[in-house]
């Protein structure tokens, strides 16, 4: 990157040449007028909204955690366009070009009705409401209460050809000089970047923080995030990515307001400065010795937020989005024949309550001891894509940039280095499995390593779901209409002349 830097004096000098420059995909990718439509099946998931339900020994998950406050990270696989038997072979020259996909449109369909789901904790760290206090109340050994609330309202999706990058605050490493003196002290924290995987929790009003490491009492947040890490997309890093693969574009809508104002229980780690630190009377005046206010109460204030109204007038889903110009250098080119769609939506956050009886006999009267309550949450998705066929020329300048960006692309195109042939004569034993011959050579077949194999995604296979008949699908018809590729024909008006009946002549 070319930057102007100061010299030893006060004059800024231009950067030294030459400087490597990353080209936009529009500079070397040629687009064709061939478009395909792809649509997934109806994608459904069912589970418990707060935690995994495990077997008696805890080794097997019987009911997975499925929450409306989770990210859904889809990894959509597309067919290799270079293996297509195109009807018009003049579209590209396989000796000088390679075919790639470009994303031109997407529609993320959401099923199920709009609804508000609540979260909470049966032992929530809440002393009392601090907005309208009628008397001065101190803390006791255990002030936890059963509390629930509706989370912050979030609608968001990020489109790219590599996974979405997230950020969260986590516990940092302590300096060596202070490593042995951290009991009861607040640990240092640092901002970390991680990939957003399917099932990760997003922020519901308590921040993007690793609650598993930084919430010792397991009561500061709700059950669904108390043992999780809440992540937030790192839009700043993805916007400044030199290649722009992680985020072609995104849509985001968040809203919340502080509904209740509480104070935490426990001792204050960073006490209000007083005379003990030479700050007497700077922040408060002490009360008389016979008053309750003599012992100052906890000052760890916090709100529980509310996502407020959920309405169909402010929905990001079930509507098409067209990609004309991406925010980065990659203008929608799907390297590796895959697209990553990361979704966060809790506007369909209804949790089903299912009640069953524990008695085999018919129940005549209501008895809560004989009724068992269950919680379930369901989600429904369907993803539609408009793909454009594009050509990449196999010239040195283009291949050098693609190789620097991702050398695996050239391997998929079978453009790697071809070694010289070895000796054509090999030893072939007939009875290789018998005890009379040597052990067979343990040569494992080499497979291409998946760079995203260690991450968890909702895999969607669309390798056999592409169609050229765009007018047969809802998103395809919308694309043809907005692109001006198809106009609605008016019916031809025809007029039929009717002859008048001849009058009979009177005789």
Curated annotation (Swiss-Prot):
Keyword Disulfide bond: yes
GO BP terms: endocytosis involved in viral entry into host cell; virion attachment to host cell
Cell location: Virion; Host nucleus
Swiss-Prot/TrEMBL keywords: Capsid protein, Disulfide bond, Host nucleus, Host-virus interaction, Late protein, T=7 icosahedral capsid protein, Viral attachment to host cell, Viral penetration into host cytoplasm, Virion, Virus endocytosis by host, Virus entry into host cell
Cell cycle found in the keyword field: no
Entries under InterPro entries matching the protein: Capsid_L1_Papillomavir (IPR002210), Capsid_L1_sf_Papillomavir (IPR036973), dsDNA_vir_gr_I_capsid (IPR011222)
Domain of life: Viruses
Subunit structure: Self-assembles into homopentamers. The capsid has an icosahedral symmetry and consists of 72 capsomers, with each capsomer being a pentamer of L1. Interacts with the minor capsid protein L2; this interaction is necessary for viral genome encapsidation. Interacts with protein E2; this interaction enhances E2-dependent replication and transcription activation.
Protein name as annotated: Major capsid protein L1
Organism: Human papillomavirus 9
